């Protein structure tokens, strides 16, 4: 399990959502985290850095997976750059160059071009595409409302508490 940068306020939302989804499977033993590393502080990846993720995966392969000789089915990654670091470490350890050749399933997010190509080549399992056109459209609507002295639209008035106040947000689907 890998997490995003601890300095990014969205990182805990992804991590907690993923762990909440995986919890029943971890609890009943259908899934295991070989390293036992499942807390946010341990799995987070400072600055979403690919090289940092690759180094952590190399260390996990050495310490938990006998240098690549123990099976590993998959790795949860919250960002395509982190995913590419993980995949490089797995490939270098001999797990295979593609999923078909034994490379563990690695998730991702942001649909970066390099990762989309890796998906097409059978290397990365998947990614999440967030349509920035929708984000830009909503941002323009909100900025226009604010410029006209109106309240920008918010569809979440409870989730994002920054410790000082709850920040109203518009969550895209």
What are the roles of these predicted feature ranges?
Residues 1-173:
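A residue-level marker of the well-folded mature domains of exported/periplasmic proteins
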């Amino acid at each position: 399990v890998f997490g995003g940068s601890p300095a990014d306020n969205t990182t805990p939302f992804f991590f907690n959502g993923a762990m909440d989804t995986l919890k029943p499977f971890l609890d009943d033993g259908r899934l295991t985290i070989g390293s036992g590393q499942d807390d946010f502080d341990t799995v987070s990846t400072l600055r979403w850095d690919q090289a940092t993720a690759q180094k952590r995966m190399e260390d996990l392969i050495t310490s938990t997976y006998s240098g690549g000789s123990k099976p590993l089915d998959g790795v949860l990654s919250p960002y395509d750059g982190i995913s590419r670091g993980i995949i490089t470490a797995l490939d270098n350890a001999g797990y295979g160059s593609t999923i078909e050749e034994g490379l563990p399933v690695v998730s991702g997010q942001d649909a970066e071009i390099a990762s989309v190509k890796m998906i097409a080549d059978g290397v990365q399992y998947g990614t999440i595409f967030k349509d920035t056109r929708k984000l830009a459209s909503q941002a323009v609507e909100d900025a226009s409302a604010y410029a006209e002295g109106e309240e920008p639209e918010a569809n979440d008035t409870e989730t994002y508490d920054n410790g000082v106040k709850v920040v109203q947000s518009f969550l895209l689907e």
